[in-house]
Amino acid sequence: MTSYEAIFRRRSIRKYKNDEISPAMLEKIEKFGEDAIGIRPDIQVKWKIFRKEEHQLKGLFRVDAPYYVVLYSEICEDYRKNAGCLMEQLSLYLFTKGIGSCYQGGAKLKKDQEKDMELVMIMAFGYPEEPLERSYEDFRRIELKKLVTIRGAFGKVQRKLLEAARLAPSAMNRQPWRFVSSEDRIHLFVKKPGKLGYQTQQDFNLFDAGVALSHMLVTAEDQWFDLEYQKLDSILEKEFQNYVYVGSLLIFNDSEKI
């Protein structure tokens, strides 16, 4: 199974067996994380994998799993989006190996040892004690037509990219993303949170935007679409009442011919 195929079958796992993952598999998982490329390869990140008895977690909505992976990042522009893009690639990879995972957005380590970097996200993982997969019909997602504003041509490339993004997981399944699609680009926005808990929710929204971008980039890699992620000055200069501009995927002409 490929990571692209995993997009259409993966589900969050909240019940795990206590079975050990082999050292060789753990090494592969660690290497995959280190080799993954986000939207900002220049941002310094660090992965840390540990068993549940090695560190104590604090926070809400924690899942009891045999293993956890932590993603740290330097704090800079786009770091949350980049982290979401990286960690979702790892989640899809785990699924292809028969390993379940679940984001722990409300969890923190009781003793955080990386002083110069921010702990962006913790993900629980291990062999599942519940079904690993779900059918396409079981996804509880907003319809594509309610997420996308179409301007101009809308072909197979745009449809495949946006359908993959639509299926991305998000905090509390809020699905904060919205898209504007044209002939040669897709613009990604996220909803502005309400006043209560604004910064926390904004942080989650930006991480989730990275997760959606990950699905589109994985799709492009699998389907041989030629894309480039950019933030366009012409949009950055604008103020939007209800949305925050995340970035744009530029679609090059040869993609439609493949």
Please report, for each region that a protein language model flagged, where it lies by residue.
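Acidic, surface-exposed loops and disordered segments
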Residues: 1-258
